[in-house]
């Protein structure tokens, strides 16, 4: 059996139609007895864990931009600073699509620092 590199597989997937990809996904799930569940569903199931989950201190936080406020340009600049590798257009789109997660799975210190910077720029931010 030929061994394909990840790049070769991606190129093959690019040539497939959406219907073909869906059929492939279903066959993959059946063959390996797995499901392609969205990560959000896993996080929601974990949050529904009850009191045991509440007793544990969270070590990963999501920084959610609830509202950009009146000083949108300043918030866009801070978003570019907080989220590495983000261009001006991407940062603007992110700010305008609030409420939106800016950082996901950040450490407590990083999340608090990002929240402080964004709030100083005039944004309404929450940690989840």
UniProtKB/Swiss-Prot annotation:
Homodimer. Part of the ribosomal stalk of the 50S ribosomal subunit. Forms a multimeric L10(L12)X complex, where L10 forms an elongated spine to which 2 to 4 L12 dimers bind in a sequential fashion. Binds GTP-bound translation factors. InterPro entries: Ribosomal_bL12 (IPR000206), Ribosomal_bL12_C (IPR013823), Ribosomal_bL12_C/ClpS-like (IPR014719), Ribosomal_bL12_oligo (IPR008932), Ribosomal_bL12_oligo_N_sf (IPR036235). Forms part of the ribosomal stalk which helps the ribosome interact with GTP-bound translation factors. Is thus essential for accurate translation. The keyword Nucleus does not apply. One of its GO terms (molecular function) is structural constituent of ribosome. This is Large ribosomal subunit protein bL12. GO terms for biological process: translation. Keywords: Ribonucleoprotein, Ribosomal protein. CDD domains: Ribosomal_L7_L12. Belongs to the bacterial ribosomal protein bL12 family. GO terms for cellular component: cytosolic large ribosomal subunit. HAMAP family: Ribosomal_bL12.
């Amino acid at each position: 059996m030929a061994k394909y590199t990840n790049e070769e597989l991606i190129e093959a997937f690019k040539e497939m139609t959406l219907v073909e990809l869906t059929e492939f996904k279903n066959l993959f799930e059946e063959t390996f007895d797995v499901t392609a569940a969205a990560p959000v569903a896993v996080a929601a199931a974990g949050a529904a864990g009850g009191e045991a989950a509440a007793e544990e201190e969270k070590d990963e936080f999501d920084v959610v931009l609830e509202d950009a406020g009146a000083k949108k340009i300043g918030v866009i600049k801070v978003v570019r600073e907080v989220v590495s590798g983000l261009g001006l257009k991407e940062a603007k789109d992110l700010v305008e699509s609030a409420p939106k997660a800016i950082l996901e799975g950040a450490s407590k210190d990083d999340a608090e620092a990002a929240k402080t910077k964004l709030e100083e720029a005039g944004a309404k931010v929450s940690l989840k």
